[in-house]
C-alpha cells in the first residue's frame, strides 16, 4: 500500500481469514484470478474494490454471448455456472453508509437501503444481505475503533445553526 514490506506483525498485512471476514470467498477468488503470475499486495483497501468488481462481472453475465462468457472471470470462478446478479448499491457505498449511520447491526443498514431502493429486502436480495453483514463487520472492526469525535468550534456552531434555520424554513 505504501511501498513498504507487508508484515502481519507490523499490522500492514492481511490474511485470507481476515479477507473472509470482510468480503466473500468469490471476491477473494477474483483477486487471485486476475494476473495469477504476478505478486499481489494484500491490504484492506483492496477488498471493497474487488467485491464491487466481482458483482460487476456477475451483472454482465446476462449480457454475455458464449464467446464473451469465457472472458468473464465470474464464469470461471463459478466453474461455468454463474448467476447473473445486479445489486442496487455497491459494496463501497455500503461501507460508507455503515460509517456514516454508525451501523451496529444489519437492521440499521437495511432501513437506509430500503428507502434508497424500495422493494429491496434481505429476502429478495440475499447477496446484498451478505454484503451488508460484511460492511457492518468492517465498520465494527476497522472503522469504529479509530473514529474520533470532537465538539464543533464557535464558527462551526454558527454554520450549523444557520443550516438548521434554513432547513426549518423548508419543512
Which ranges hold each PLM region?
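Basic, alpha-helical terminal appendages of large translation-related enzymes
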Residues: 115-171
Amino acid at each position: 500500500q505504501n511501498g513498504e514490506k507487508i508484515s502481519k506483525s507490523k499490522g500492514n498485512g492481511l490474511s485470507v481469514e481476515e479477507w473472509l471476514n470482510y468480503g466473500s470467498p468469490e471476491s477473494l477468488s477474483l483477486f487471485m484470478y486476475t494476473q495469477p503470475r504476478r505478486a499481489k499486495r494484500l491490504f484492506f483497501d483492496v477488498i471493497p474494490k474487488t467485491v464491487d468488481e466481482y458483482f460487476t462481472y456477475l451483472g454482465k453475465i446476462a449480457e454475455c454471448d458464449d464467446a464473451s462468457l469465457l472472458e468473464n472471470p465470474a464464469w470461471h470462478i463459478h466453474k461455468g455456472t454463474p448467476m447473473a446478479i445486479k445489486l442496487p448499491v455497491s459494496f463501497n457505498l455500503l461501507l460508507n453508509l455503515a460509517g456514516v449511520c454508525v451501523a451496529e447491526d444489519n437492521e440499521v443498514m437495511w432501513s437506509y437501503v430500503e428507502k434508497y431502493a424500495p422493494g429491496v429486502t434481505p429476502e429478495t436480495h440475499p447477496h446484498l444481505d451478505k454484503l451488508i453483514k460484511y460492511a457492518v463487520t468492517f465498520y465494527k472492526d476497522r472503522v469504529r475503533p479509530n473514529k474520533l469525535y470532537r465538539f464543533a468550534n464557535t464558527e462551526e456552531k454558527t454554520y450549523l445553526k444557520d443550516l438548521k434555520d434554513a432547513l426549518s424554513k423548508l419543512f
